[in-house]
Amino acid sequence: MNNNVFHFPVLLDAICKLIEDLPVKSDLIYIDSTLGEGAHAKAILEKYDFLSLVGIERDSQILERAKQFLLIFKDRITYFNDWFDNFFANYPLNVKANFILVDLGISMFHYKDSKKGFSFLEDEPLDMRLCSSSCSISAAEIVNTFSKYDLESLIYNLSNEHYSRRISKAIVEYRKIKKIQTTKELQSIINKVYPFSKVKINPATKTFQALRIYVNDELARLKRSLPLWVENLAKDGILAIITFHSIEDRIVKDFFRSLSCDLYVKISKKPIIPSSDEIKKNKPSRSAKLRAVKKI
């Protein structure tokens, strides 16, 4: 396994500013709901010695990487190998959190080194399960068994892919001849039916996004977690959520809007986005949006 940490901590300066706005800076609890390789956690723990970290990560493989990466801070960290919605539904701590961070992006490790088929840049088995024991269906099973209508609905509803009908038809026609097993196979099917005059990103990008979201139940997990996150904030505590596509950002935006003004206040009216300098250094950050709310 490649032990280099791939993940660049997106919107780190904005996150640090939120932490600096906490009124008390002594013995505070910081929960990283999506620990990943620990890039955000390392930068935050280095800068703020008054924080203790609770790190939540469902993928046991990437959690072990994070533990090694954060070894110097081991006395300040408690780890949980779990989905964040399960953790907060059965909240195990005897104190509320002062700062909760949620980064909904997929780690670079999963794209570059997991061999689970999250990326079409390498030819890998079409799996996409972050946790095979709790995710019942793989991406390969979806593209090989779902009806044309169900594929079209899945791809459109989870990625806003305008050519979902064309793509789903091509998938169904292809699998009549041969089972779809790898990322490159699926990418090739999509590329052949996509109008290249319309291409701004790789034609397969949105379909892969939709499959990943479905396989890992990402949107339902987010919706379940939102009320649990705010419920488990301490007074003056802050919940910060980084989204990477319009569907999940809308869910977060609408939830924050629904909160009582007597109990919570939005940190900013509009989402915080990366600077041009950050995007130059880390191209995947270009679609990131940070929304935050404070419990009063």
UniProtKB/Swiss-Prot annotation:
Keywords: Cytoplasm, Methyltransferase, rRNA processing, S-adenosyl-L-methionine, Transferase. Its EC number is 2.1.1.199. GO terms for biological process: rRNA base methylation. GO terms for cellular component: cytoplasm. It holds the Pfam family Methyltransf_5. Its main location: cytoplasm. It is found in: Cytoplasm. It catalyses: cytidine(1402) in 16S rRNA + S-adenosyl-L-methionine = N(4)-methylcytidine(1402) in 16S rRNA + S-adenosyl-L-homocysteine + H(+). It comes from the Bacteria. S-adenosyl-L-methionine binds at residues 38-40, 57, 88, 103, 110. GO terms for molecular function: rRNA (cytosine-N4-)-methyltransferase activity. Belongs to the methyltransferase superfamily. RsmH family. Specifically methylates the N4 position of cytidine in position 1402 (C1402) of 16S rRNA. This is Ribosomal RNA small subunit methyltransferase H.
